Structure formats: C-alpha cells, structure tokens
Amino acid sequence: LSGCFAAAAQAILGEGHVHRGLIATGDQFISGAEHKSALYSEFRAMAAEMEGGAIAQVAAMDGVPFAVIRSISDLADGTAADSFDTFEKHAADASAAALRQALRAL
C-alpha cells in the first residue's frame, strides 16, 4: 500500500521529494533541532507527527491496511510558523493530487 502511494507522490512531485521510512508519532509538536535529532538517533525517524499513531493502532487491530501520507510543513528548526503559512496550500494540493493518482492505481 505504501509503495502505491509513494509512486503516485513521486509522479506528482518529481525526483527527490518523496521519502519512505519511519514516522514518529506522539503527543507533542516537535519544533527544535535537538528533539528532532534525538528522535532520529533513537528511532531513525524521518519525520514526526501527532495523528497517525492512533489511527495506525486501530487499523492494525482490525487488520485494515494503512499508510500515513504526510506533507512536511516544517523542518523542526524553530521556523514552524513561517513554514506552515508558506507551504499549507502547496502541501494540500500536492497531497490531494497524489492521493487521487494512487486511488486510481488501486
């Protein structure tokens, strides 16, 4: 499932913009480089978010295939407010286009 979504996103966004790997999930916003570095060092997490873990747990319990698709809105380097405003529309448009393409392929 994740391969299908990755291929669709790659087709929309082009080379070098799609990454597959572990996404950490938790109950806090990761905004500093130190916390970001700790998550990578301990778990090799490529990104962090706050919603996917609970959905993944329920999907796994019910045997439902699941993939997290994330557009990275900030780099966890203290510039989150600026980054979000800059990338919100682009991220939403690109994610929607990739999802439409992936669903057609399923």
Task: Outline where the language-model segments fall.
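Glycine-rich phosphate- or other oxyanion-binding loops that anchor nucleotides, phosphorylated ligands
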Residues: L1-L106
